[in-house]
Amino acid sequence: MEEQFTNQKKVSHLQSLMNTKRSEQPTEFAKKHRFKDTLALFLVFLSFNHFTSLCLLVSFIVATKCKDFLANCFIILFLSKKPSRHIGEVAHIDISTSKVTNGSSNRKSNSRFFGNSKNSFVIPIPVLICEILFAMLLKIYGGDYFVKPIKNLAISIIASFLINDPSDCLSYATSCSVLYAVSTNTFQRVSHFFDIIQLFDMSLRGTGQSIKLFTVFRKYSQFFKKLFSLFLPMPFKMLGKHSDSMIYYLSFHILFFSFASSLLHPHRQTAENKPLKKGFNSTKPDVARVQGLQKMRISSSSSVSADSNTLEDQSPMIPNDPGGLSSSNQTIHPSQQNNSPVPLSSHSNILNPAASYPTDATSSFPYFTSMVKEYKSYQPSVISAEGSNSQAVTTTTSTTTSPTTFNFSGDNTSLSNEISLSDSSNGNSKKDSDFFSPSNDKYTNQLFELNVDFGNMFSSSKLSSDISVTSNLENFIRLLFRRKNQHLIAPLWSMVVTLKTTNFEKKYLQETSENSLTPTNSNTSYVSNQEKHDKDLDTINTHSVSSRISFTHAGKFKKSVFNNFEPSNTMALIAKTTSDDYNLLNLVSTNENIFNRNDNDYKVCIIDISTNSITFHIENLHDGELIVLVNGVIWSEVSCALILEHVGEEYVVVNGLVPSCSYDIQFINRLNHRDDYLVSDLIVRTCGNNNAIAGKFENLDFSFPSYYHRKFLSPLLTLKHSVLTTNANLSDERTKLKKTKKEFSKKLSLLRQEIDYFKGRISQNATHDEKSTLKVENLKVALQQSETAVNKLEMQLKTLTEKELELEEEYLKKKDLHLKNQLEFSKLEESLSKDLKNSEGRFQKVNQELVQLGSKLDKLNARNEKLQKEVDQNAEEIEKFSTQFLSKREKDRFRRKEYRIREANKFELTIKGLEQDINRLENENENIHSLIGNSY
C-alpha cells in the first residue's frame, strides 16, 4: 500500500511538472522571438504608403486613448447589452468624500477602469501647445536629422506595443529603430564603395516602384482613399500634400506621450509585472489564500454552538469569535438614504482577509430607501468548514482535478472577482497544505434586521440597480484593454482574441444545436429541437442520456470555452458536479437575451420557512409539469395547491428537509414532456429546532455562507444530512417504541378483561335476539315506504327543475332586455351629460361676457359723469371768459375810435396844408412858365 501511495505521488508530481512545462512552453517561445517579431512587424509598417501609415498612427492613438470606449463596444457586441454603469451611480457612493485608506487605490483603479470615457481622450491645452511648438522647432531647425528618426521610432513603438508587454515596449522599440538606422547607414556607405544597388532608397512609399510583397497594401490603400474621399470635406489632393507633416506630428505625439508616461510613472508597469521574491516561493500568499478557499470548497458544516460564538457590532473581522452573534453591542441605526453607501474595498477584504481593516461606520452599510425605518447590522466572521464542523465530507468522489470558480460579489456592488481553484491530488494535498498554511481563513458576512414601513411602498423611489450576472465577463473584457497589467498577449491583440472567442462559441452553438440532447440557450435552437423531437419523453432516462452525451458527442461538448471540465484547458465559469439530475435535463432558454425580462415570465416568492419544509408561491405557471430539484436531486416530498382565484398561480410546499441546513432548490417547468425551462434557482436555509435567539438573530452556521458554497450543495451532502437526521430520528423512535410497547401491553390486558365481560353479557341476553329480529322486519317495511316516498319526491324534483329551467330562460331574456335598456340609457345619459356640459360651458361663457360688459358699462358711466363735469366747468369758464373778452373788446374799440378820430383830424390838417402848398406851387409854376414864355 505504501509503495502504491508513493507511486501515485510520483505520478501526480510528474503530471503537475508536465502540465507546468506545457503551460510555460508558449510563453517562453513568445518571449524568445519577441524581438524578431517586432523587427519584422516594424519593417512591414515601414513599407506602408502615406495614407496607410497615417491610418495606422491615427488608429493607434485612438486605441490607446479610448480604451473604455473600445471595451464598451466589445461588451455590446459580445454580451448584447449595455455596459454596466459606475458603481457610484448604482449604489449611491460618493467616491470623492470617502476616506477609507484601505480601498483608496481600489477606488482609483475602479474609477479609471469603469469611469466615463468622455475625458479619456482629452489632452490639456497647454501640453498640446507645448508639444506642437517643440515639434515645429525640431522640424524647422533640425530638418531630416529629427523628422525621419522620430517617424521610425513612432512606428517601432506601434510594432512593439502590438507584440510586447507595456513595460518592455520602449526598450524593444528603441532597439529596433536603432538597429534599422545603423543598418541603413552602413549599407549606404558600403554601397558607394562596392557599387551595390541601394535597395533602401527605393520608393516604398508614394507612387514609385514598390516591392511585390507589398502590392496588396497599395490596393487596399487605393480602395480606402476612394472611400474616405466620399466623407472628407476637403479634396484628397490637399490631404496628400500635408500627409508628411501630419504623419510627423502624429508620430511626435506618440513619441512624446509614451516617453512622458514612462518617465512620470517609471515603476508603474515593472512593479506589477515582476514576481515577488519573498521566501522560497513567490506565490506563497496566493497559494495560502487558495488553500484556505479549497478547505471551504471541499467541506460543509452542520451547526455552530451559540455559547462559544460572539459578534462585535460594526467590525468586519473578529479573530477570536469566528461565527456567532453577541447581543450586547447591537445599536439601532435610523435609515438614511444619503449616509449609507457600500465601500468599494469590500472585495479586497473578502479576497484577502489578512489585509482587511475596520472601515468607517458610515461606509459599511448598504443603501436603503425610505421604506426602511430602522435597521440593525451584524457582521459575523466566517471560518472554513473544517474548523467549525467535524462532520465535513467532500462532495467530489473522483480523484481527478476539477476547476471551481468562486464569484465573490457584494450586495450592492457590480465588481465580482473570480478565483479559479483546483483540487489537489492524493499525495500532494498534504504537502501543499503543510508548506503553504493559510495565515487567516476568516471572512465576514453582513446580516441586517430591517424595520419596514409598508405605507411608504408606493411613494418610495425605485433603486436604479444595474448589477447583472455578466459582471465577470465585463471585467474580463475591460481588463484586456488595461495597459498597466501584464498579459500573455498584447492589449491591442486582445480585440482579435475576443472576436475569435465569440466566433468559436457561435460555431460551437451551431454544432450543438443540431443535437437534440444538447442544452440550448436561444429560441432558434428551441424551434429546431421542437422539429426534431417527434416523440414525447415522459421521464428522464438517466442512463441513455448520460451515455449518449459521454460517448457520441463527447468531442463537441469539450470544445466550448465556457463548458470544458478538463483541468488543463478549462475556462469554466460555473462548477457543477456530474452526478446531479440537473445535468440530465433538457434545458431550454426562455429568451434569446437574458436581460429582456417580461411580466409574463416565471415568478417565485418564498412564503414560509420552517424546520422541515419551505412554502413557495409560483406565478405564470400555466402548462406542463413542475419538477422540483433539491441539491441537484429530483425531490419527491413535494405538494402543490392551485390558486383558483388566479390562473397560473399555485403554492408549492417542499417537505422532508433538515433543520438549520442550506438547500439549493430549483424549479423546472417541463412542456410537451421534453423541453425543460428553469423557473428559479434559490438557496434557502431552514430554521432550527431550538428557539434560542441571540440578539433577535438565529445562531446560524456561518461556515456555510450564502452563494459562496453553491458547489457544496450536492446530492452526496443531501444524502449525508438525511442519513444523520434519520439516525437521530431512529433513536428517538426506538425510545418511543419501548414506551408504547409497555402501554400497549397494559391496554391489551384491559381489553381482554372487557372481552370476557361482554361475552358473559351476550350469553345472558340471548332472549333479546327475537325482539331484535322483529325490529329488523319493521324497519324493512318502513324502508320500503320511505323508498316510495323518495320516488315521489324525485318526480316532483324533476318537474321543479324543468320549471326552474324555464324560469331561468325567461330571466335571461329579461336580463338581456334590461341590459339593452341599460346600454341605451347609458348612451342617452352620456349624450345628455355631454350636452349639459356643453350648455353649462356656454352658459358660463355668456355669464362671463355679461359680467365683462356690465363692468365695461359701469366704467363708461363713470367716465361719462367725469366728462360731463368737465364740460360744465368748461362752459362756466367759457362764459366768464366771453364776458371779460367782450368788455375788453369794447374798451379796445372805443380807444381805437378815439385814436382814429385823432388821426383823421391830423390827416385833415395835413391835407389842408398840402393843398395850400400845392396851390402855392402851381401858382409859382405858372409864374415861371409865364416868365419863360416871355423870354423866348
Curated annotation (Swiss-Prot):
- Bilayer disposition of the protein: Multi-pass membrane protein
Q: Which residues lie on this side of the membrane: Lumenal?
A: 1-41, 142-245
Region feature (Disordered): 297-351, 387-437, 512-533
Stretches that traverse the bilayer: 42-62, 121-141, 246-266
Biased composition (Polar residues) is annotated at 325-351, 512-529
Subcellular location per the Swiss-Prot or TrEMBL entry: Endoplasmic reticulum membrane
UniProt entry keywords in alphabetical sequence: Endoplasmic reticulum, Isopeptide bond, Membrane, Transmembrane, Transmembrane helix, Ubl conjugation
Q: Which residues lie on this side of the membrane: Cytoplasmic?
A: 63-120, 267-936
Name the GO cellular-component terms: endoplasmic reticulum; endoplasmic reticulum membrane
**Compositionally biased intervals (Low complexity):** 299-308, 394-405, 414-428
**Record location of the Glycyl lysine isopeptide (Lys-Gly) (interchain with G-Cter in ubiquitin) cross-link:** K10
Q: Does the keyword Membrane apply?
A: yes
Keyword Transferase on entry: no
Additional comment:
Present with 996 molecules/cell in log phase SD medium.
Name-wise, this protein is Protein NNF2
User: Species lineage, top-down?
Assistant: Eukaryota, Fungi, Dikarya, Ascomycota, Saccharomycotina
Q: Which gene encodes it?
A: NNF2
